[in-house]
Amino acid sequence: MFLYEKLDTIKEVDGLLLIPHFLKDNLNNRVELRDYQIDAFQNFITYYNSEGLHKNKQIHTLLHMATGSGKTLIMAGLILYLYKSGYCNFLFFVNMTNIVEKTKENFMNRLSSKYLFAETIEIDGDIVDIREVDNFQNTNENDINICFSTTQKLHFDLSVPQENSLTIEDFEDKKIVLISDESHHVNTLTKKGKDDIAEEQSWEYSVNRVFTANRGSRKLFCLSLPPLVI
């Protein structure tokens, strides 16, 4: 049985866990959640808090949503939720630089009409700042620290360590939430039949390497549905 089928059963029998107030309160007040976005949040929260659903494995979640349906808003809300759950370091990576820049606008630019968080983020009575970082070596655990990268740059940084860039040690020493948009691009280089050397040079190998470096890390992938052709 697929995970979504298990969650559908839970929804019918016991009901899904509700979205906590702090999550809604710390999103931009112009945002009105759509029904399917509420479902997405409740599905994740129920899954995250149900040991039987992930069988004590590292949490690795795929959100399969249509282009323009508000995937980035879901990411923003889950960043808040996971921060409250003890995660302060987030790696956002995607295949194209322009998507990285658009997401920075959504997450970092308070003056933008597309900014997704509240003007002031307050969790458990504390003001929480969102900071863009180049790596996770000296991050403040009281902040939400986000490192933005392309999949290609992430792979290069891990393969050719440089000063102030991400290294595998960042991921061994800290719990990191990995967030990938348009994640179907991540595994385009790894195919059946490739030899081990080619696989170790792939982007997918690098992503899996950082994910498994610390058992406490979490992975959230977002995948767009293809356009409907009529």
Where are these regions (language model features)?
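RecA-like P-loop NTPase motor core of helicase/translocase proteins
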Residues: 1-230
